[in-house]
Amino acid sequence: MRHRKCGRKLNRNSSHLHAMLRNMAASLIINEVIKTTLPKAKELPRVVEPLITLAKHDNIANRRLVFAKIRSNEIVSKLFRELGPRFLNRTGGYTRILKCGFRAGDNAPMAYIEFVDRISANNSKDIN
């Protein structure tokens, strides 16, 4: 029986699923918005949000815990340098999922996942 088994399998074995979620988390941290299928987008905050919570307090232990999940020094440094201080006053809910229609090939539901306080190019004001 499947009682109390949390998370989605997404039609993959466990190593493929962990690798895919790790790569998607890295892409989300670098680009701050990605487009993916809706079930993958719903699964991604379970990976990303604990990393941002750790990045709020910059110490060597938290850096090592984040590095164990992401395995990239540049992503870890961006997480602790930019994203951690940005979300310092927010207690959770760092990501937002926006549905964006269906994929042309197989009609899969697609979604954008982004950070809530994302600084976009069209939001910035030109100061003269």
Curated annotation (Swiss-Prot):
Key words, A-Z: Ribonucleoprotein, Ribosomal protein
Oligomeric and partner information: Part of the 50S ribosomal subunit. Contacts protein L32.
InterPro entries linked: Ribosomal_bL17, Ribosomal_bL17_CS, Ribosomal_bL17_sf
Entry's Gene Ontology BP terms: translation
GO molecular function, one term: structural constituent of ribosome
Gene Ontology CC, one term: cytosolic large ribosomal subunit
Family: Belongs to the bacterial ribosomal protein bL17 family.
Name this protein carries in UniProt: Large ribosomal subunit protein bL17
Gene3D superfamilies for this protein: Ribosomal protein L17
